[in-house]
């Protein structure tokens, strides 16, 4: 038998070492140093000393698991959730909120400085409630044959297994209180073994639920779901596949308010998870853009108008460009019901060649963009060609924000302000926004 060897394979030295963390990374892992190498340790806070065991070793860094904590940081707090440490939803409930925000802001500042050479402050942080903030969640469903029970919950940390969730303090209370009765309802269905997942969403006009089912539901099951809907005042939608949606109720369309405007959305549409931070984020963008009645504004990756509509109330015209057709349709509808006839929405793929797209032939003096995690490298050169006075970049990935910032800086723009958005407390997610000006 031929055997193959990898000469570059690094053997992990699994003996126990003692380290002291001096920092946190964005994921909430303790950052320590040992013999010149950076060691990342989940569960360790700055100032804490611990015995750890290496689990992965690279040339420049290593990962380790906590064996025994030898001291406690004053920033260590008791997690509110009984599932913390097993559930993969939150990683930082053991960390005082002030330290969470400080660490994320420092990571953002470091990434921008490393990529652009510019020193910025990402504070003051835009923040909201530490718990009870999440107005949208997707829960997995798995039928356990031996236990004859459907598990409803989130994925375990670093695993595909589900944690049965009975409570979740980061959810809005209106959604958290649905968890146990929803579990009872779904376990009573004939189709209990053929359910995929469930999404809970809190609109301003009430909660809604989307149930993904793998086989057509019997009338008896629909009646049980209808009873659940009435008893708990929740709109129920059934999804037989990834595109179809059947409403069990004759209830009004879901909507939320931003900047005093009503935005109607489809149950599956993307909306910002944290309402309070979203309100502040929109207000900050409007302030930074210094909007005037004669402005012509471009809103890229605009969704259904979360920024577009509030901007449209102030300026001469605004064009929103979005790649998802349903979001564009909802944006157009929202502009109509809010009597904003100076807003245009374009359905275009911003990851394709944009130069032949109709909006690209127009002139704008101010630009806002809110791309997905991949960033906006495909449109940055065109933004530079527009020569706008101000650019506001909203980001869910600090790495791509830092990368794309470089293009604006090389074109003569300056970073005027940066803010870290604490959109997802107790998690490693880092949202931010930046203002650029010529």
Curated annotation (Swiss-Prot):
GO biological processes: rRNA base methylation
Pfam family, one: tRNA_U5-meth_tr
Keyword Transferase: yes
Annotated binding of [4Fe-4S] cluster, by residue: 81, 87, 90, 168
TRAM domain segment(s): 9-68
Binding positions (S-adenosyl-L-methionine): 272, 301, 306, 322, 349, 370
Keyword Cytoplasm set for record: no
Record field: catalytic activity: uridine(1939) in 23S rRNA + S-adenosyl-L-methionine = 5-methyluridine(1939) in 23S rRNA + S-adenosyl-L-homocysteine + H(+)
Residue positions of the active site: 396 (nucleophile)
Broad enzyme group: transferase
Entry-linked InterPro entries: 23S_rRNA_MeTrfase_RlmD, MeTrfase_TrmA_AS, MeTrfase_TrmA_CS, NA-bd_OB-fold, SAM-dependent_MTases_sf, TRAM_dom, U5_MeTrfase_fam
EC number(s) reported in the record: 2.1.1.190
A GO molecular function held by the record: 4 iron, 4 sulfur cluster binding
Keyword entries, A-Z: 4Fe-4S, Iron, Iron-sulfur, Metal-binding, Methyltransferase, rRNA processing, S-adenosyl-L-methionine, Transferase
Described purpose of this protein according to its UniProt entry: Catalyzes the formation of 5-methyl-uridine at position 1939 (m5U1939) in 23S rRNA.
Family: Belongs to the class I-like SAM-binding methyltransferase superfamily. RNA M5U methyltransferase family. RlmD subfamily.
Protein name: 23S rRNA (uracil(1939)-C(5))-methyltransferase RlmD
Species name: Photorhabdus laumondii subsp. laumondii (strain DSM 15139 / CIP 105565 / TT01)
Gene that encodes it: rlmD
């Amino acid at each position: 038998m031929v055997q193959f060897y990898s000469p570059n394979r690094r053997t992990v030295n699994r003996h126990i070492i003692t380290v002291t963390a001096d920092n946190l990374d964005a994921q909430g892992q303790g950052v320590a140093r040992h013999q010149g190498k950076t060691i990342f340790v989940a569960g360790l806070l700055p100032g804490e000393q611990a015995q750890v065991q290496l689990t992965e070793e690279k040339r420049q860094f290593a990962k380790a698991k906590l064996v025994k904590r030898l001291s406690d940081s004053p920033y260590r707090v008791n997690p509110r959730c009984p599932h913390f440490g097993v559930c993969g939803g939150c990683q930082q409930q053991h960390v005082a909120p002030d330290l969470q925000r400080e660490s994320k802001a420092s990571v953002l500042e470091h990434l921008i400085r490393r990529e652009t050479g510019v020193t910025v402050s990402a504070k003051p942080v835009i923040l909201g409630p530490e718990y009870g903030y999440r107005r949208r969640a997707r829960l997995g469903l798995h039928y356990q044959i031996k236990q004859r029970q459907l598990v409803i919950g989130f994925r375990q940390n670093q695993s595909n297994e589900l944690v049965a969730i009975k409570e979740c303090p980061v959810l809005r209370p209106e959604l958290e209180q649905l968890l146990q009765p929803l579990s009872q309802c779904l376990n009573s269905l004939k189709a209990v073994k053929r359910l995929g997942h469930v999404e809970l969403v809190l609109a301003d006009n009430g909660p809604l639920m989307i149930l993904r089912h793998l086989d057509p539901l019997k009338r008896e099951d629909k009646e049980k779901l209808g009873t659940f809907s009435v008893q708990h005042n929740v709109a129920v939608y059934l999804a037989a596949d990834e595109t179809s949606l059947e409403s069990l109720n004759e209830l009004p369309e879901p909507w939320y308010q931003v900047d005093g405007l009503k935005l109607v959305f489809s149950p599956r549409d993307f909306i910002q998870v944290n309402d309070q931070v979203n309100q502040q984020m929109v207000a900050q963008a409007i302030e930074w853009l210094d909007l005037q009645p004669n402005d012509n504004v471009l809103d890229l990756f605009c969704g259904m108008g979360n920024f577009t509509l509030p901007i449209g109330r102030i300026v001469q015209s605004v064009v929103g460009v979005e790649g998802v057709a349903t979001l564009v349709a909802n944006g157009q509808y929202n502009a109509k019901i809010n009597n904003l006839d100076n807003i245009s929405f374009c359905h275009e793929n911003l990851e394709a060649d944009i130069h032949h797209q109709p909006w690209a032939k127009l002139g704008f003096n101010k630009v806002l963009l809110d791309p997905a995690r991949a960033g906006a490298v495909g449109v940055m050169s065109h933004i530079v060609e527009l020569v706008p006075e101000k650019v506001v970049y909203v980001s869910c990935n600090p790495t791509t924000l830092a990368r794309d910032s470089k293009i604006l800086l090389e074109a003569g723009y300056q970073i005027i302000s940066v803010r870290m958005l604490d959109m997802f407390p107790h998690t490693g997610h880092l949202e931010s926004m930046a203002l650029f000006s010529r």
